[in-house]
Amino acid sequence: MAQFYYKRNVNAPYRDRIPLRIVRAESELSPSEKAYLNAVEKGDYASVKKSLEEAEIYFKININCIDPLGRTALLIAIENENLELIELLLSFNVYVGDALLHAIRKEVVGAVELLLNHKKPSGEKQVPPILLDKQFSEFTPDITPIILAAHTNNYEIIKLLVQKGVSVPRPHEVRCNCVECVSSSDVDSLRHSRSRLNIYKALASPSLIALSSEDPFLTAFQLSWELQELSKVENEFKSEYEELSRQCKQFAKDLLDQTRSSRELEIILNYRDDNSLIEEQSGNDLARLKLAIKYRQKEFVAQPNCQQLLASRWYDEFPGWRRRHWAVKMVTCFIIGLLFPVFSVCYLIAPKSPLGLFIRKPFIKFICHTASYLTFLFLLLLASQHIDRSDLNRQGPPPTIVEWMILPWVLGFIWGEIKQMWDGGLQDYIHDWWNLMDFVMNSLYLATISLKIVAFVKYSALNPRESWDMWHPTLVAEALFAIANIFSSLRLISLFTANSHLGPLQISLGRMLLDILKFLFIYCLVLLAFANGLNQLYFYYEETKGLSCKGIRCEKQNNAFSTLFETLQSLFWSIFGLINLYVTNVKAQHEFTDFVGATMFGTYNVISLVVLLNMLIAMMNNSYQLIADHADIEWKFARTKLWMSYFEEGGTLPTPFNVIPSPKSLWYLVKWIWTHLCKKKMRRKPESFGTIGRRAADNLRRHHQYQEVMRNLVKRYVAAMIREAKTEEGLTEENVKELKQDISSFRFEVLGLLRGSKLSTIQSANAASSASSADSDEKSHSEGNGKDKRKNLSLFDLTTLIHPRSAVIASERHNLSNGSALVVQEPPREKQRKVNFVADIKNFGLFHRRSKQNAAEQNANQIFSVSEEITRQQAAGALERNIQLESKGLASRGDRSIPGLNEQCVLVDHRERNTDTLGLQVGKRVCSSFKSEKVVVEDTVPIIPKEKHAQEEDSSIDYDLSPTDTVAHEDYVTTRL
C-alpha cells in the first residue's frame, strides 16, 4: 500500500511506516502576508489599511496573496460580508478576478453593488468582463453573473444586473441540428450539455421571469413544456430538467395565488396574446386557461382561485347548488334529464327563447348529454335481451325496433366526433384517449350496421345456425356489436370525473392501464420464448387418432403444445390455473422428455406468477399511490377538462337531436354555399376606420389592464417570496459566522475609540502646558534641565494609556480633569495648525502621495477610520512641539535620540492583542527625516505614572530590564531602554 503514497526506497529506516509528504505543495505566505490576511479575516480595518499603505511604499507584501483555501483578501471580505473592507480593498485596486461571482453566490447585495460600480462598463451596457483564473476559479467559463444570480434566485442581485443591461444566451431547440450545436456536441459533449442545463436553470428562475418577462404566465408555460420535452432527450439530466419544469409550474401557480378579486382573475384567464390589435377577439372565452390545459399546467389549473371562477360559471343558473341537500340535487337532475327532449326541441325551434338559452348553460348541457347517453345504454340493454326476436335461424334478419332506435344515437355520436375533430384539429383530437375510445366504438357500430345490411341483402333463407359458416356476416356482426357494447358501457367511466369521490379512482384506473401495457411487453417476450421451446419439444407427440375434441378446451385436455398457437393459449391460461400438469406427459416411455417438459412448464409458471405478476402488482400500486398523493390536483385538472368541453359554444344539442338540422344550421349552410359555390360571390363590406379604431382601442385597453394586473401580481409575489425566505431562514452556521465577524470588528472599533479618546485628552493637556510656558518665559528658563526634558517629551513615546471613557467625557463636559491630564481650551493657533494639517504633512514618510484626481475623489467623500484619526492627531502634536522647540532653541539630539527639528515620527504599534486582557504596550518609533528621508527605529516603553515608578524600581523581579534613562514629565515618568 505504501507505493501509493511515496516512491519506494529500499534504504528506508522504517519499513513499517508510511512517510507522508505534501505532493502538491504551494508557495508559503510570509508572516506579513499572514498577518494581513488574518486582519482581513478578523475585520481589523486599521491594520488592513496600514498593511495596504505599507505595501504601496515598501512592497513588503503582495496584496493579492492567496491563503491555503485559495482565497484572496477580497474574497475573505466578501465571505465575511464586510463592506467597509471590500470598499477599502477596491480603493487600493486589488485583483478582482471572479469576486463578483463569489459575491453573487454568497448573496451579498452590497458587495455586488460595489463590484459593479468598481469598473464602469464601457461600450455596451454590460457588466465588466470577469477575469477568471483557470487554476483557482470555482466557476466554469459558461457561468456569467446573471446566470449565477438566477441560480441563487436573489431578486435584488438580478435587478442590479438587469439594470446594467446584461443578457442571457438563447438556448436552441431540443432537437436542434444546426452547425453550432453539432460542432459543440462533438468537441465536448459534456460541456455542451452542462452549459445548456445552466442556461435553462437560469431561465427557470422565478425572480428572473418575474423581473424580465412581459407575460410571466406564458413564459412559465412554454418553458415548463420545453423542459419536460428536453428531459426525454437528455436522459442523463432527466431529473434536473423535470425539477426545473416543476419549478416553472409552481411559479405560475404561486403568481396566480396573488390575485385578490374576480376582476383580476378574469383579466388573467381571458387574456389572449396571439391576436393583433385590429383583430376581433372574444373577451370571455378563458383563452389563458385553455393554454394552461394544453401545456398541462396542473398546478395552475387546480389553483383554488381558478377553480372558484370555473365553479361559478359551471353552476351559472344554480348559485346555491352546492349548499342544497343531496336528495334535492338528485331530484333536480332527474327532472332535467327527463325533460331533455323538450329542451332540445325548444332550442331547435327558437334558440333565443328562455328554454333555448337555458339548455346552453354548461351544467344543464352536461345533464342533458348524460341523460341522452344513459338512454342509449338502456336501448343497448334491451337489444341484448332479444325481446322481439323470434326467427333466430334467419341468416339475414331485418333490424328490430330497438335497433332502429339505436341507429340515430350512433349517427349522432359519429356526427359529434366529426364536429369535434373539425373544431379542435386532428392533433388535439388524438391526444385525448377518450376520443380514441369513441373512434373505436363508432367504428365497431358502423361495421356492425354494414355487415347486417350485407347479410340482409345476400341471405334471406332460414337455415339452422349450427350449419352457418364461421365467417358468416351475421355472426361477425353480432360479435362486433357485442364488443361495441362493452366499449359503450366503459365509456360511462369518463363521467365519473365530475364526482369528487369517483374522479380520483377513474384517474388511477387510467394510469394503471399504462402499467399493464408496459407489463405486456415483457410478458409477451417470456410467453413467446417458452411457447417456442415447448412447441419444439412436444411437436413430435401430437395425437390425432380417436379424439372427438382436440385442444385444451376439451373435457380432457390434450395436444396442449402441439402447435404454436395452442402452446400460447395453454401458457396464457396456465396463469389462472386452468391447465393440468398431465398435459406434459407423452404416451411413449420417454421419461427424460416428460421431465424436461414439466421443468420448462414449471419454470414458466414461476417466472410469470411469482416474478412478473408481482411486478405488475407493484407497478399498479405505485401508480395508484402517485395519484393518491396528488389526488386533488389530478382530479381538478381532469374535471376542468370536462367542464371546458361544455363551455364551448358548439355541441349544445345532445344525441340524437344533433343530427336534426336546425334553422340556424340551415342558414349557415345556405350562406356558405352562396359564398363559396355560387359564381357571384358576396363581396365583403369593408370596415370603416371608426370600427377598426374602436376594436383596436378595446384590444389595447385589455392589454393595458392585463399589464397593470401583472405588475401588481409581481409586486405581491416578490414581497411574499422575501417574507417567506426570512421566515424559513432560521439560525444557520452562516449566521453564527456573521455574528462572530461583527463581534470581532466591533472589538477592534472599540479598542480604537478608547485609544483615540485617551490620546486626544493628553494632546489637550500638552497644549495647555505649552500655552502657560509661553506666558511665563522667564520662569521656564530658570527651571533648568529637568523642565527641558519635560518640554522635549514627544507623543510618539506613548503606546496606550487606558483612561475610562466616561471620565474623559465627564472632564470634557464639566471642564474638570480626572487626574490624568489637564483639559483646557485649545488656542486658535492650534486649531489653525490642525486645519492646515494636510499641507504640513505632505512630505511625511509613511503617508502615500496621491494624484490630484484621486485626492479630489477622496476629498469629495472622506471617510476616516479610528486608526487614521489617531495617527493624524499624533503627527499634529509632534509638529506642534517641534515648532516650539525650534523657536526657543531648545531642541537637542543627544543620547536620548529625541526627534529633532528635521525629523517626524510615527508610532508603530506592535502590541499583542488579547480578547481577555489588555497587556503591556511595547512600540517602535519610526522617524523620517525631511532631508535624507532615512528611517530610524528606536525602542520605546510605556509612560509610567510617577507614583508607581518608585515601586517598579524596587520590583525588578517583575520586569527584567537593562539600565534605563528616566525622564520626568509632570505626573508621568518616561523610561527609555
From Swiss-Prot:
Biased composition (Basic and acidic residues): 776-787
Signal peptide span: none
Ranges for region Disordered: 767-790
SMART domains, alphabetized: ANK (SM00248), TRP_2 (SM01420)
Membrane-inserted regions that do not cross the membrane: 325-359
MF annotations from Gene Ontology: beta-catenin binding; cadherin binding; calcium channel activity; inositol 1,4,5 trisphosphate binding; store-operated calcium channel activity
Chain sites annotated for binding Zn(2+): H172, C176, C178, C181
Activity regulation info: May be operated by a phosphatidylinositol second messenger system activated by receptor tyrosine kinases or G-protein coupled receptors. May be activated by intracellular calcium store depletion.
This protein's record includes keyword Hydrolase: no
Complex formation: Homotetramer. Heterotetramer with TRPC1 and/or TRPC5. Forms a heteromeric ion channel with TRPC1, with a 1:3 TRPC1:TRPC4 stoichiometry. Interacts with TRPC4AP. Isoform alpha but not isoform beta interacts with ITPR1, ITPR2 and ITPR3. Interacts with NHERF1. Interacts with MX1 and RNF24. Interacts (via CIRB domain) with SESTD1 (via the spectrin 1 repeat) and SPTBN5 (via C-terminus). Interacts with CDH5 and CTNNB1. Interacts (via protein 4.1-binding domain) with EPB41L2. Interacts with PLSCR1.
Protein name: Short transient receptor potential channel 4
